[in-house]
């Protein structure tokens, strides 16, 4: 189908779903009649050409799954994934045969997803959008990206997503998450489902969750909340049709003198029909005056009749209906009218329109659009919606509905009584709130919003995916260093020039690599070279390691700065809120005490928990728990942000990053050294977190101008005063060939170059120090 994006460009949309919106009926020996329908399994395995031809006229393309269908659909999709996603857990009968069955179903599920891919490949054209629907197609995003990583791929889950504690029981938990994360956009009906998904990815895959989504393979997979809607105008218009008005009048005559409670559900375990009947029974028990004035009409659409569990549910429901009607009914009147069938759309709208109360008691529901349909048909009646708090619609329509816990039959009974006795003014107010929502959050808007988000997410993802940089050309680094007149070397501390920690017997204190002591001293003593150590560590740690050198130290990501011959000054804003720090220290201590060989650093503006020297798997598990705890509460309203490193979890004040402080640091250095010669060479290397990698691009903008007249402003303060200085001079005269930004051990980075480990940086620094003292002429490299 076609789609016009926000720029007015026409794009082709491929909606991929387990069910086509059509039902088929044979009209001849080789012909079929197809009608658009709201759902229903469509799996014709014969006469493929005839069916495909008829479907093509409706812009539908079938995928014939043949022998894998039962294992894929009834087996893995509905037998394993569906119960997990709806908080029901895996089947309890677990033996060797069950395990083999799981494996067979899992293979069929992957094969079916491959078959969907094959059909997409036959129909896809460059620029098309592919929108994957629901849990039946969790492998499809990965398969699509493997086929062509330029395809715009979105995935929407129509069911709930469970907590990580439930999801992690799934044997194929990691593979499914990774496959879904290949999509450019992932969307859910509610914030709870999205939060569960992000937390699950964090706990199981060890990836970082952000307010935008999940950081995975060098990019952010965007996660959004877009609750689906209906086509409200269709229902409003249907209620005004003459034949529907006639049906409404017939229903009013049939139930004359009675209040009508309506239930419309699939006969399914999650729909809570038994709980609905138990709540209704309690209401009749406690309110005898209502027994001959009320009727509950329940439409229970049959589903999966071949499954034993569903047969048991049907029998249970029928027993409840018989018991309640036997207790409270009479020859002329029954309190429950139970219908084991579906009804046509006109009759359904008539029922919606004449009902006084809609009763939805889902035990777990992705959304429940029945509640939306009821609201759309209630322009005249202003009936009351009683809605389960476990239905996704509860987060959208909760303001105008009576929310209930369906497991609490007393609460359901009380809600029925309140709804029946509710004054018209309150009913009017509640209806107005929900009607406005249903009208403005239609299915059209849902689709448009999803596709707009997908286009935006894809464009952003393209920007995030960076080219793998080249290996650092060490000979060029050395030669350019020797030819320059004013050099700036910026080094990270942890993971860059710290002592390697390969042995469990070593101490965990951060120490300067002993191989660097003489090298660093030689570089720092060179009048043409300025060395800066930029670290997230606190002032005490840097003082302890670098007190004997003539070096510039920037602690806590540049919040504090000093030359080792002077006192610390601060760049920290005066109004920075640090109230959260003391409260989190106990949290970090808790995880440190329970994770052997982990440690945490507490500084004025940040807390860092490090588990590099702990057991890796246990450390990752503890880090996931710590992250989940932090995001759930302690910093939710604090002026702080959480950042996950490879072996660390850091919480720091908002705005504390390395890149913004480089300008302040440069200004301070220029002022203190009274520089008259512009900096013409920069070597910047570190094992930096992704959030700090903008430090590499800081100098890129300066390179655009061969010689930049630079006004640098820096703030300096001691404990007694703060001072703002303004320095105006040619700070930088930096050419492309004289700038070497270098990341350590990272394939995806904003740096120009990479090296495998800190050992490479140590060796290079030694060669630079030697280049200072050599008398051999240096040949200018080719550029």
From Swiss-Prot:
The entry's keywords: Glycosyltransferase, Transferase
Catalytic reaction annotation: D-glucose 6-phosphate + UDP-alpha-D-glucose = alpha,alpha-trehalose 6-phosphate + UDP + H(+)
One GO BP: trehalose biosynthetic process
InterPro entries: Glyco_trans_20, HAD-like_sf, Trehalose_PPase
SUPFAM superfamilies: HAD-like, UDP-Glycosyltransferase/glycogen phosphorylase
Top-level enzyme category: transferase
Glycosyltransferase among keywords: yes
Region (Glycosyltransferase): 11-456
Recorded GO MF terms: alpha,alpha-trehalose-phosphate synthase (UDP-forming) activity
E.C. number: 2.4.1.15
The organism's place on the tree of life at top rank: Eukaryota
Family: In the N-terminal section; belongs to the glycosyltransferase 20 family. In the C-terminal section; belongs to the trehalose phosphatase family.
Name of this chain's protein: Probable alpha,alpha-trehalose-phosphate synthase [UDP-forming] 3
Organism, as annotated: Arabidopsis thaliana (Mouse-ear cress)
